[in-house]
């Protein structure tokens, strides 16, 4: 199975983004029958979707997993739904801060992920890795990209796709007292297990 794994460039003054740290380390590897390609996306409204579409054309994946940073979350969060709404709390890396703007004007209000969400969470929890189903990907570039991905693929595509938020790395969280973090090795193992489930689980739950 060909899998496209994406992460984002750092934003909001951070020097690293754990989503790209994970995706880049899994690139060009074969994991449980999955061949992984990785692409780094800009943390920029509009440009992230354009770059993702180019990557889809280049790699022709059978599954797509977009990763993003969710500072403050303590678990790997498997996103259930992408909303057709940009609601930025902070500016992106080009200074854009859209509020109450649709990602795709005239398109459906939401799309559901086509990953086996419950099976993924169950697998991670069984391995002792904190995981949860999330019903909001926020209003920043992560949700924007997630919605753009699902809209581009459409409902009839055989390509399964979704979005996963991961916590800060410890070196990031130390700057924010009380914020949760997750060791890179743990997050890496968690995303490897996501790929294992993708390969073996055909249901979307």
Swiss-Prot record:
One of its GO terms (cellular component) is cytosol. The keyword Protease applies. Pfam families: Peptidase_C15 (PF01470). One of its GO terms (biological process) is proteolysis. Its EC number is 3.4.19.3. Its main location: cytoplasm. It catalyses: Release of an N-terminal pyroglutamyl group from a polypeptide, the second amino acid generally not being Pro. It is found in: Cytoplasm. GO terms for molecular function: pyroglutamyl-peptidase activity. Keywords: Cytoplasm, Hydrolase, Protease, Thiol protease. The active site is at 79, 142, 165. The keyword Repeat does not apply. It comes from the Bacteria. SUPFAM superfamilies: Pyrrolidone carboxyl peptidase (pyroglutamate aminopeptidase). Homotetramer. Removes 5-oxoproline from various penultimate amino acid residues except L-proline. Belongs to the peptidase C15 family. This is Pyrrolidone-carboxylate peptidase. It comes from Gloeobacter violaceus (strain ATCC 29082 / PCC 7421).
């Amino acid at each position: 199975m060909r899998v496209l794994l994406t992460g984002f460039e750092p934003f909001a003054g951070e020097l690293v983004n754990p989503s790209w740290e994970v995706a880049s380390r899994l690139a060009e590897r074969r994991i449980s029958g999955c061949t992984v390609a990785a692409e780094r996306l800009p943390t920029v409204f509009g440009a992230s979707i354009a770059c993702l579409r180019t990557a889809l054309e280049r790699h022709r994946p059978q599954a797509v997993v977009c990763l993003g940073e969710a500072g403050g979350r303590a678990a790997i969060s498997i996103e259930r739904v992408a909303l057709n709404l940009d609601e930025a709390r902070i500016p992106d890396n080009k200074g854009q801060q859209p509020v109450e703007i649709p990602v795709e004007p005239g398109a459906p209000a939401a799309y559901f992920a086509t990953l086996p969400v419950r099976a993924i969470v169950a697998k991670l929890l069984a391995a002792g890795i904190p995981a949860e189903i999330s019903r909001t990907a926020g209003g920043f570039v992560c949700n924007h990209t997630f919605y753009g991905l699902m809209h581009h693929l459409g409902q009839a595509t055989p390509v399964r796709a979704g979005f996963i938020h991961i916590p800060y790395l410890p070196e990031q969280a130390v700057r924010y007292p009380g914020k949760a973090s997750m060791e890179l090795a743990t997050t890496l193992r968690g995303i490897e297990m996501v790929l294992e489930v993708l390969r073996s689980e055909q249901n979307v739950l």
